[in-house]
């Protein structure tokens, strides 16, 4: 269960997997969470990922969450014209996700200076991704 990995993380990024466990199932047991520290033991970065499948068997997605103190990412996105659908979705907690779709593939990305929350999958709708990112209840402390 990916939720069992949450205690490994520092809490700089908080997210809730409860809703996912109720509406999706783990499809590939490749979920991981780990922290990287420098040679002096100081925190550098943390990573989490897990893959989920729709309970009806018709779709899947991978959730990846990364926080790295060495990053200086830009939350600005450049969307090229090849997506069938591309728009911003802001969660109730105020985090902005770029949601895109092309064919049977969907993506959702939220980027801050030090953090990336990313989902990609297939055979799901952009509305499905909106529900997922909303119920993740992401909170980022940078």
Question: Which sequence ranges carry the predicted segments?
Answer:
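Surface-exposed amphipathic alpha-helical segments
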Residues: 113-142
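Short, solvent-exposed recognition patches
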Residues: 1-112
């Amino acid at each position: 269960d990916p939720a069992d990995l949450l205690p490994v993380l520092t809490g700089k990024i908080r997210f809730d997997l409860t809703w996912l466990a109720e509406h999706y199932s783990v499809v590939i047991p490749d979920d991981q969470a780990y922290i990287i520290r420098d040679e002096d033991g100081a925190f550098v970065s943390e990573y989490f990922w897990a893959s989920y499948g729709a309970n009806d068997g018709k779709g899947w997605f991978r959730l990846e969450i990364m926080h790295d103190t060495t990053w200086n990412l830009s939350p600005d996105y450049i969307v090229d014209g090849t997506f069938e659908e591309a728009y911003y979705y802001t969660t109730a907690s105020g985090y902005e996700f770029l949601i895109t779709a092309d064919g049977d593939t969907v993506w959702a990305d939220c980027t801050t200076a030090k953090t990336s929350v990313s989902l990609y999958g297939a055979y799901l709708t952009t509305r499905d991704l909106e529900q997922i990112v909303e119920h993740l209840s992401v909170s980022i402390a940078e």
